[in-house]
C-alpha cells in the first residue's frame, strides 16, 4: 500500500489507494479546499486520480503556475458548457490553454457578435457560480467515440479517429449535462473558475489547414483571483495605449500598405530613429572590434541547397529567376558571411574574425501573422558571425554576453531571462565536442554572474545556443538576443583556416544577434517608451517657438545655432497662440520646447519646457546647448532636471 512522500520530506502511510484530494484532506481542510490537482512523481494528475504505489506528491493550488494553467483549461470547458446551452447545435473542436488564457474553436451556424460574446460570458458566470463538481471518467476509446458520435460532435470523433490509439482510455470531463474530452487535469469544482473574461473572436481553420473549414475561435483570459484579473486587464489597457501601430501613426513614423504586405514605408521621423539606432549599434561594433560588411540580398538557389536552407526553409523564402537561374532572396545573412570569409587564405592568426552586417532580409511570413513592425516580411538584422577556433569559443561567447547586456542596459531593460539550449537527439559532431561547447556557454554565463536555466534537447542540430528574453515595462517577454554555436555551416560551405600545425581546419561559427530585427526592436522601444523616446533617439529633439513675429529672427538664429551643435531642431514660427503650439509639440512627444518672447530676446535666453509639462524656467542658450549635448552624448534615459 502506498507511502506518500510530501515536498518537505515527511511521509504518510496508507493501507489503501488514495487520491491527491484524500492526502490534502488528511493534512487539513484548508489544503483540501485549495487543492486543484496533484503532481505525482513529477506528473500532473487530477485531484481524484488514485495513487496505488509509493510516490512523491505535491498538492497543486491556485498559487502554483500549474494551478493557474489548470484553471484556464477548465475555463475553456466552461466556455463549451455555456455555448452548448445558448446554441445547442454548436460543434466543439479544440480548447487549449495559451499565454494568459485559453481559446475554443467552434463550428457555429452564425457569426458571433459582440453582444453574443457578452451573453456567452454572462452564461459562463452563471454556471461557474453554481460551484458544481467536475466529474472525471476514464472510458474506452469505443465508448468515447460513441459518446461524441451520439452528440453530433464530429470534430471530437475526428480527434479520436486520427490522434488517439484504440487501446487508449480517454478522459471525459462532465460539467453537468456537458461533456468534454481531455488529457487533463482539470479543477475538481467550478469554484476555482470565477475570474475570467472573454476577449475577442477570430477565424481559425480546423487543424490549421486552409483547405479545411473556417471555425470561430473565442479567446478568453482567466486568473486565480479578481485582483490578478483586473491587473491583467489594466495591463492590456495600457498596452493598447502604447500600441506601436497607433503611436507610429500619431508621430508619423512609418506606414504599411496592401501593395507591400509586411514591408515598412519609413517616413522621415521613423527613419531618423532607425538611423540613430544604427549609429548606436555601430559604435558598439567598433568598441567590441567587429568588421562591418555588406552581402548581396539574393544568391543562387544552389548555395541555399548546400547550406540546407532550401530543404528546411524553402516555404519561407522568396525566389526569383533570371537567365534560367533561380535565385533566393536571403532570409538570413550567415551564408553570405561565409562567402566573405572564404575569400583569401585564413590562418589561425586571423581568428577570431568578427563580421557584422545590417542585412536586409526577407521571409515569406503568413499574411495572417503580420503585425505592424513586430512581424514583417522585410526586415533588417543586426546580426554578426564570429569565426573562431574551438579554444576561442568561451572568450568569444563572453564578449557576446557583455555586448548584449551593454546594449540592453542603454534602453533601460533590466529584467532579462536567459536560457541555454543543449544537444538534441539528432545532431552532428562528437559527444566530446558538444560537452565542451555546452560547458563553454555555461561557464561564460557563470563568469558573468548571469542566472540561467537549461532547455534540455532544445539546441539546433548544429550546435547549442543561448537565448536572451527581455521584459518590458508591462512585463511582456520579447526574445531578441541569441548566441548560437554552429559546427555545420562552415563545413558545408568549405570554410577553413590553416592551424598552428599547418593543417587545414574548419572554424567554429558563432551566430550572434542582439536587437534581432531593427524594425521589431523599434516597435518594442515605441511601446516601452510610449513614444516618449529618450532625447538621443527622438526624431526632433528641440522645437523653438516664437510668441509673436517680432521674435522670428531670434528663433531662426537659435535654430541654426542648435543645428550647428548637432541637435535635431525645428523652428515653429506659425501665427498661432503659444499654448496651441506647446500642446501640439507635446502631443508629438518632442523632448524640449524653447519659447522665445521679447524678454528672452532682450536677455539672450530661452524659456525651457519639457514634453512632460515641466517648466525649467529661463536659461542661457549656451547652457541649454551644453546640457542637451551631454544628455544626447551619454544616451541618457532622463531629461534635464529629472
Curated annotation (Swiss-Prot):
Matching PROSITE patterns: AA_TRNA_LIGASE_II, TGS
One example GO MF annotation: ATP binding
Enzyme nomenclature, EC number: 6.1.1.3
Keyword Flavoprotein: no
Reaction equation(s) it catalyzes: tRNA(Thr) + L-threonine + ATP = L-threonyl-tRNA(Thr) + AMP + diphosphate + H(+)
Coiled coil: none
Required cofactor(s): Zn(2+)
Keyword field contains DNA-binding: no
Quaternary structure (record): Homodimer.
Annotated family: Belongs to the class-II aminoacyl-tRNA synthetase family.
Protein name, UniProt field: Threonine--tRNA ligase
